């Protein structure tokens, strides 16, 4: 009997010592420091993962004539959305249309004509509800600054006064507008004989600015940003459809919510003012 009591007493003592040791370890400063370090590491990892999740790259495909204005708008947007990277592809609207059709990364498309946007939408490649008519531009005839070329109208380009005229090719909206204008004037055959075809409107602008062409046909906004050219005149009234710039979200956008936020930014008064500073006519309305 005494042995049993002695054994029970010994067992209780062992349990008590073990419990005390555990309690002592829980208060050990080195143990707490390890636990705190682990918590901080886990918190840092969570914050890093959250930060990575917020970083987004939006691919904006836009007509070449929008290069300067969208570059300024992008700077403004970055101030308000530092987590968003805007990556632009500027080219002719026809080239950009082909890129979207072939599956190139694209979140937002801004065309220099309705034709390309409508064709993409008919193929089911655009979010139809997101498409808006954003801007209007003017088609103008230009010559190099200080040029003595004696022309005053689109009709004069067909005369012997002009040896080479720079125009956009057939898949470039400004080239399509040019063809329509001269077909309506009954002068398209004469123009083709002296035409030098460019891949986009900025190439037309460059050829005239560097005097590699006598004259050229561009948008008013392009002429406004190039000091080495001057506007001769606007296209004859009624000679072509208005140069409307539609914008919309690509159906397969990887980031449709962020693309919508960028589209909403284009609708603000702040951005409207920037567009107008570059001589665009802002036509969007709710």
Regions found by a protein language model. Give the residues of each.
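Sec-dependent N-terminal signal peptides of Gram-positive bacterial secreted proteins and lipoproteins
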Residues: 1-26
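A short glycine-rich beta-strand->turn/loop micro-motif centered on a GG-aromatic cluster
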Residues: 6, 87-92
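Exported/periplasmic ABC-transporter solute-binding proteins
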Residues: 22-75, 94, 101, 113-114, ...
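Signal peptide-proximal N-terminal region
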Residues: 76-88
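Periplasmic-binding protein-like
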Residues: 106-111
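A short, gly/pro- and small-residue-rich
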Residues: 123-131
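Short, glycine-/small- and polar/acidic-enriched structural segments
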Residues: 131-137
């Amino acid at each position: 009997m005494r042995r049993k009591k002695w054994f029970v007493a010994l067992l209780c003592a062992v349990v008590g010592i073990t419990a005390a040791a555990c309690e002592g370890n829980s208060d050990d400063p080195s143990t707490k420091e390890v636990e705190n370090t682990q918590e901080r590491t886990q918190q840092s990892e969570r914050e890093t993962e959250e930060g990575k999740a917020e970083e987004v790259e939006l691919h904006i495909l836009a007509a070449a004539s929008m290069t300067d204005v969208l570059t300024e708008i992008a700077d403004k947007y970055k101030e308000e959305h530092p987590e968003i990277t805007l990556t632009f592809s500027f080219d002719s609207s026809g080239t950009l249309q082909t890129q979207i059709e072939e599956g190139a990364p694209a979140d937002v498309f801004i065309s220099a004509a309705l034709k390309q946007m409508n064709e993409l939408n008919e193929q089911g490649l655009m979010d139809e509800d997101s498409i808006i008519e954003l801007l209007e531009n003017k088609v103008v005839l230009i010559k190099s600054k200080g040029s003595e070329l004696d022309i005053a109208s689109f009709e004069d380009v067909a005369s012997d006064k002009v040896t080479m005229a720079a125009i956009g090719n057939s898949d470039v909206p400004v080239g399509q507008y040019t063809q329509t204008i001269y077909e309506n004037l009954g002068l398209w055959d004469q123009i083709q004989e002296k035409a030098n075809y460019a891949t986009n409107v900025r190439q037309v602008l460059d050829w005239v600015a560097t005097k590699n062409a006598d004259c050229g046909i561009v948008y008013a906004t392009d002429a406004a940003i190039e000091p080495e050219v001057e506007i001769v005149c606007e296209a004859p009234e009624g000679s072509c459809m208005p140069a409307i710039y539609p914008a919309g979200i690509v159906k397969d956008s990887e980031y449709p919510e962020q693309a919508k936020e960028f589209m909403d930014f284009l609708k603000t008064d702040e951005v409207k003012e920037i567009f107008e500073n570059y001589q665009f006519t802002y036509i969007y309305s709710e």
